[in-house]
């Protein structure tokens, strides 16, 4: 494969020197871009877009044509793994993901297969290979998965949830069943991410979107334990280069020390965590990614620039920072504002890397 022309992102994750702070955006390929909407319309629906390697490749590359981003992330969905387990994923207009066959009983968990990344999830691997080929070494490609806990919330609830009633009922009434499910998911995610790495992903990220819904003790037992298992099982070197691993628990700022002890290379931060405090606590062990509130992108260019400057100043000089939003970019943000954000990070961060 082509030699990497811009390795700022990978270097920052490994706390190595860079010339400017690298930047990318969660959900950077998405509905805020008119070209994405056109490609999705061509695909017909969201999962058809994910399953078409050529179209998934196209939307992955779209933000790079607009902005000088330092990384690109595979266009896919965290629910591809449970879908490949046979739960029947579909999307209800205005309501989000739904599963036709949610997990209700222990026997449902026992019957779950562990998907083969090159068979049931082969369309994802094909997309990774196509993207790497089209990138021609421009920037690194990030692969990703949902964390076992986060995937389990959708599988047990049958879709999105705000109260997490069903999975918390399982957690407190049938913890052995939940552990069995999480263990199967961890094994599946290891295979899935290693498949992405073999196909060409140069870094991987675990999205623990709903870990923050747990108590501290439950987080360690039902979420972090399984992310640790995944980190232990991942390929950490491919094609002679280290493959960095980033963990992101939304609402998990109180658990950074425990997360850093998993052996990951970096932690993602949401905007509720002070990045200066995070660096003091774990900056000698891991890089940090984040953490601007995505809603700042509704502001003027001057307001966006001010927030970027504040976060850069809070992190301070030196290595180990990847600038990002604290969660995904909102679908109604003007693309020009995202462009101002990326440019501001590169321009304002130069003085921190002398």
From Swiss-Prot:
One of its GO terms (biological process) is protoporphyrinogen IX biosynthetic process from glutamate. Belongs to the uroporphyrinogen decarboxylase family. One of its GO terms (molecular function) is uroporphyrinogen decarboxylase activity. Its main location: cytoplasm. The record marks 77 as: Transition state stabilizer. Homodimer. InterPro entries: UROD/MetE-like_sf, Uroporphyrinogen_deCO2ase_HemE, Uroporphyrinogen_deCOase. PROSITE patterns: UROD_1, UROD_2. Keywords: Cytoplasm, Decarboxylase, Lyase, Porphyrin biosynthesis. Catalyzes the decarboxylation of four acetate groups of uroporphyrinogen-III to yield coproporphyrinogen-III. It holds the Pfam family URO-D. This is Uroporphyrinogen decarboxylase. GO terms for cellular component: cytosol. It is found in: Cytoplasm. Its EC number is 4.1.1.37. It catalyses: uroporphyrinogen III + 4 H(+) = coproporphyrinogen III + 4 CO2. It is an enzyme of class 4 (lyase). SUPFAM superfamilies: UROD/MetE-like.
């Amino acid at each position: 494969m082509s030699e990497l022309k811009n390795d700022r992102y990978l270097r920052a994750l490994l706390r190595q020197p860079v010339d400017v702070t690298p930047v990318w955006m969660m959900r950077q390929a998405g509905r805020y871009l008119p070209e994405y909407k056109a490609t999705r319309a061509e695909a017909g629906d969201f999962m058809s877009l994910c399953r078409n390697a050529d179209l998934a490749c196209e939307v992955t590359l779209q933000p790079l044509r607009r902005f000088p981003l330092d990384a690109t992330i595979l266009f896919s969905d965290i629910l591809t793994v449970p879908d490949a387990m046979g739960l029947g994923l579909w999307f209800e207009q205005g309501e989000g993901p739904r599963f036709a066959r949610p997990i209700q009983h222990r026997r449902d968990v026992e019957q779950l297969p562990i998907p083969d990344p090159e068979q049931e999830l082969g369309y994802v691997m094909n997309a990774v290979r196509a993207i790497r080929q089209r990138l021609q070494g421009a920037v690194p490609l990030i692969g990703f998965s949902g964390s076992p806990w986060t995937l389990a919330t959708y599988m047990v609830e049958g879709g999105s949830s705000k109260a997490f009633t069903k999975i918390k009922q399982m957690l407190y009434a049938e913890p052995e069943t939940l552990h069995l499910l999480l263990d199967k998911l961890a094994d599946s995610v290891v295979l899935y991410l290693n498949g992405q790495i073999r196909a060409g992903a140069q870094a991987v990220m675990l999205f623990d979107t709903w870990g923050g819904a747990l108590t501290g003790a439950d987080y360690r037992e039902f979420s972090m334990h399984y992310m640790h298992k995944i980190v232990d099982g991942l390929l950490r070197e491919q094609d002679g280069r280290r493959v960095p691993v980033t963990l992101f628990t939304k609402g998990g700022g109180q658990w950074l020390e425990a997360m850093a002890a998993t052996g990951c290379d970096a932690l993602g931060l949401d905007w509720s965590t002070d990045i200066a405090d995070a660096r003091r606590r774990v900056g000698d062990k891991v890089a940090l990614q984040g953490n601007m509130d995505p809603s700042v992108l509704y502001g003027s260019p001057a307001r966006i620039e001010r927030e970027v400057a504040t976060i850069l100043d809070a992190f301070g000089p030196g290595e180990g920072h990847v600038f990002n939003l604290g969660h995904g970019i909102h679908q109604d943000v003007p693309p020009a504002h995202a462009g101002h954000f990326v440019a501001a990070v590169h321009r304002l961060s130069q003085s921190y890397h002398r």
